[in-house]
């Protein structure tokens, strides 16, 4: 398989997986079976009780869109990863209300801090009792693996720089 097809497949897999998961986010496997009559094996319209409510079936959320804008910036910078490229990607992503509405508390606080605004977030002081935590870094970073195939040390360093 060509490098192009591997990269395209990675990007498409992430986008489709995000669009499929938008309707089930935060649900347990048991609840998914209850709510949808079994496991979800196609793209469906997100119900009114999830983060993606109001979106059409097939729309991506912050999970893919953060990675997409990170990838675009990596391409624009010809694979040179630095803090400024990371900021540009994050600020561009945040300028799209349809994606920024999904921003988790750590991503929102990071954007405010990078803009020089006070990043007080009351959610950060509440103990998480729902077995969930934010994962803005994890969901946006797969493009770093695409530009560093076989070079784990560089991928780790680029991940640290971006996140």
Predicted regions and their residues:
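Structured, active/binding-site neighborhoods that engage oxygen-rich ligands
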Residues: 1-163
């Amino acid at each position: 398989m060509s490098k192009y097809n591997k990269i395209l497949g990675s990007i498409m897999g992430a986008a489709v997986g995000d669009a499929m998961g938008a309707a089930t986010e935060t649900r347990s496997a048991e609840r998914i079976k209850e709510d949808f009559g079994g496991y979800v094996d196609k793209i469906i319209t997100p119900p009114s009780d999830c983060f993606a409510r109001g979106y059409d079936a097939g729309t991506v959320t912050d999970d893919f869109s953060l990675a997409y804008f990170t990838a675009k910036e990596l391409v624009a910078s010809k694979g040179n990863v630095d803090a400024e490229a990371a900021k540009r990607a994050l600020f561009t992503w945040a300028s799209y209300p349809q994606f920024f509405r999904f921003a988790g508390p750590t991503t929102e606080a990071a954007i405010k801090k990078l803009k020089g605004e006070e990043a007080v977030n009351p959610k950060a002081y509440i103990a998480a009792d729902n077995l969930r935590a934010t994962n803005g870094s994890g969901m946006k970073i797969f493009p770093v693996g695409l530009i560093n195939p076989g070079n784990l040390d560089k991928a780790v360093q680029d991940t640290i720089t971006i996140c």
